[in-house]
Amino acid sequence: MSKAELAVLERRLRPIYDSLDSQQFKKALSDCDKVLKKHPNTSAAKVLKALTLIRLEKLADATEILEALDVPGAHHDELTLQAFVHCYRDSNQHMKVVTLYERIIQVDPSEHNLTQLFMAYSREKMYKEQQKIGMRLYKDFGNAPYYFWSVMSLIMQAQENPELGKKMLLPLADKMCQTQVEKSGYTEGSSAELDLQLLILEGQEKWKECAAFLDRPQASVLPMAPYNLVEKGMDFLMKDKQYKRVDQLAMEAVTKMPDNWNLWKIITESTICQIEQCLESDNKENIELAHNFVKRLGLLIEKVQKQVGYKSRAPFIATFFAYKQIGKLTKQIPDMDDMTSIFGEQVDKMLEYAKNFYKKPVCFADLQMFFCDLTSEQKSNFLKGIDLWIGEVSAKDDVEGDESKVWAIILTERCRRALGEYEKMDAAGHRSLFQQCIAQIAAPERTEHAQGVLCNLTVSHLWDAYRKENDLTKFYEMILLLEFVAASNKTDPMCKLALIRAYSALCATGRISALVKTLDIKVIQMDTLGHLTFPVYETSGRFNLAIIQNTQLSLMYEQAEKEIQDCIAQAYRNGKFSAIPRMTAASKHMKLSAQKTACDVMNRYLSSLFVLDDVDQITVTLWGDEDPIGEKRIDWKQLIDTRDFNAIPYTETEEYEALLDDMKKRTFKELIDISELRSTLCRALGAVGRVTHENMEPRLARLQLKMTVMEFKQHLEYCCREYPSFLIPSKLAQSPAPHHLSQWVHSGGLQMVLEYLEAAVKLVDILDSGEHPEKSLVGTRTEMATKLIKLIEIPPKRKEGEKLPPFWIVDPIIKSSRALQTIAAIQVVLRLIEKVVLKLVKNVPTAVPEPVGKGKGKKDKKAAEEAMTKALDECKAVVFLEHIRAMHVELRSAGNFLHTYLGQMLALEDEYIPSNIGEDLGGAKAALEGMHNPVASRLQRSFLNTCEDMHTTIKLRF
């Protein structure tokens, strides 16, 4: 098609593009029909119509159009091809983009089409195929960059298969690269050839050659800052064990960049490596040489410290790092037990650091890294020194606008807490400290930064009481304090993050939603911070909000993947090859995110139970439309933990790290297990519906049904063993929102669903044998009603005359949500069973049979009615169907019972929000009391909205 014809076509299609861009999909569909009415052979308009149908969620209609047009031998213009690509990407059929361009180059092997095929292969990580296309582009069009695309494809193949890469792929890539450089030289102003050569050398682990390569004049054009170039060169030398050369370069560089912490780490690690080499033998000369290495490091640190004064932190931290690394030596240096003469006394150095850098908020984090290296005596001496110093600072006159004293107090209290002093204090001491912190936070003209750090310190103290003693009153006081700070502090996000974590334990979804909006979390952070809110909407029964949140997360992952792939394509075009492996790794990281998979599975689960009505659509959603025949399965063992637990800082003792590590492992395992449980349940439910699908091979459908039900049963039994009923969620401040898997698997609800799934398996076998099912296959209505009432009756636990504890309402809300999910799941199973019976039973009357003859009198009519009644009674399948339909009545009754129970629960007179707050706090009590009414009102409204949402769901679904 000529440019003029293409311009005419684009002008004709412009209204459709505008409607699609403005998301007016019905108008876009109308515009497509208008164009096709006048120009029925316009392929671009047909494909745009398919794209519109995809966005209107009419995938079947869109697929019909696409399959008719995307056939071998078809010619398509550029606008049509672009529309095809959008269709396939929007419907997650990325491999069809590859097939599309493979067909196109058979009829039109233009440079543009071959380039698009190369990029399509790149998106699907088909590196062998893209290598061939790269070479074809180079041979056909003689453009050197295409040659380098082929070389880069070899490097990517080598990364996928390291063994083959070292033997064949990387040597081949090296030879190809050298041949091209010898033939054409380096491209002026471009780093493409250099990038490739360095990647090849790194892949072959030729560290000496890598270091020499960076010394070449041409290396200056590599896409990295000069100081990064120096650091990378030293990193290569370290790997090649050229420690003397590293020392020479690093010592020269550190005098120019004294605050570059990476240089200090390299110098120290190089020194340690040389010491370890010396200690391999007990030779006196080697031992003396080891002493000299330590002394040389000490002299360098001292020299740079004098050079920079207290303007830079890195030279002073280097002293602590040297102590730490030398202490880690597997074999200690003889005659050097005390290094005070070289580096100075460690505690004195740490006190000196605190006195000179305490105004920097990062000062505590710098010191905390090295507290674990101190002995008990050293810790005690450090605390004594800090107490003396804070006394001196406090004695100084106050200066208006100067917060030096506040930062000194903050550093002191954080150090005391991290070194275990808080654990030695009694309850009165803790309360007094809490009072002082509130006074400092509420002080007039307190800067937002200092206020936020003070609040974080205070929250750590109150969260401890909640974690260790389950003190819900102090937990509520913590929420009040956080709300007090969040109301006035617009810049510090830590308080809002801590509030989200606190409210997630209370299922206070309304306030969580508001806080997430005010935080303005960046899109990519939704992956790492999603754990703060992920299961809350589901556990609290707000299923529509859960679906919205999960949909937003899914869209974020799709958009991130698209942007990464676009960046990779751009990197190929610009010759920035060193960025491609990193971006490919990022893409893989996003694809294997456990959070992403958990969101997708929960969306399928909740949408099928509470949103969709059509049985066929429910079946497809439950099974997963990306897995039509069951070949693709989630590999749960490959999923990656992308959660960021450093979002909420902590000031704790060394033992807390072990608790944190244990929490990370346990909560990640729970996330995987609950997601797999939902997934196996979805697939088992979907497999029941797939038995009735026309396009399913009957034997495969039945095999899948048996296998998926067995998988669900086995995983449910596994979860019951792994998560005993007495297990409680982690109460660490950094832990994710609780999933309550233990409560769910021991509630009895999932076991009920399993019973009906197993009945469905037996039902299919019975029907296949030509027999009709008995009512007993699914149990009686009375049995169902008894189990449902037991599932729903979840009154708060208390002794006679005893008041309920604060926030008692949270547990019944969670149990009600899970009970509602059970009722909905059973409803879906029964609907699917009903469809199976209607599909598989031969000659089942679905309506009342017509009489054979027309009776004239009352006697004849009565006889006809009796005959029909007898015929229906004799048909077991009809009786079974009527029994299934009657069981739906029990489900509706259970829904109404749950509705009534929620109303009664809200009517209980027991207060679920603590009222005795701020005791023994003196004047600081006013700050908490001022927040009590608005916070209590928000919590009550949130709990009420949660119950109302469940009421609405019950009315709509049952």
UniProtKB/Swiss-Prot annotation:
Keywords assigned by UniProt, alphabetized: Chromosome, Chromosome partition, Cytoplasm, DNA damage, DNA recombination, DNA repair, Meiosis, Nucleus, Repeat, TPR repeat
Primary residence: cytoplasm
InterPro entries in UniProt: NAA25_NatB_aux_su, TPR-like_helical_dom_sf
MF GO annotations: acetyltransferase activator activity
Residue spans crossing the bilayer: none
Highest taxon, organism lineage: Eukaryota
Tissues where this protein is expressed: Expressed in germline and somatic cells.
One BP term from GO: meiotic cell cycle
Locations listed in the record: Cytoplasm; Nucleus; Chromosome
Single GO cellular component term: chromosome
Effects seen without this gene: High embryonic and larval lethality with viable progeny displaying a high incidence of males phenotype. Defective chromosomal morphogenesis, segregation and alignment due to the failure of central region components of the synaptonemal complex to assemble onto chromosomes during meiosis.
Pfam families assigned to the protein according to its UniProt record, in alphabetical order: NatB_MDM20
Keyword Transmembrane helix applies: no
Residues in TPR repeats: 7-42, 78-111, 320-353
Annotated family: Belongs to the MDM20/NAA25 family.
Quaternary assembly: Component of the N-terminal acetyltransferase B (NatB) complex. Interacts with acer-1.
Function according to Swiss-Prot or TrEMBL: Non-catalytic subunit of the NatB complex which catalyzes acetylation of the N-terminal methionine residues of proteins beginning with Met-Asp or Met-Glu. Required for chromosome organization and arrangement; specifically for assembly of the central region components of the synaptonemal complex onto chromosomes during meiosis and for DNA double stranded break formation and repair. Acts downstream of xnd-1 to regulate levels of histone acetylation in germ and somatic cell nuclei by controlling acetyl-CoA production through antagonizing the acetyl-CoA hydrolase activity of acer-1.
Protein name: N-terminal acetyltransferase B complex subunit NAA25 homolog
Lineage start: Eukaryota, Metazoa, Ecdysozoa, Nematoda, Chromadorea
Gene that produces this protein: cra-1
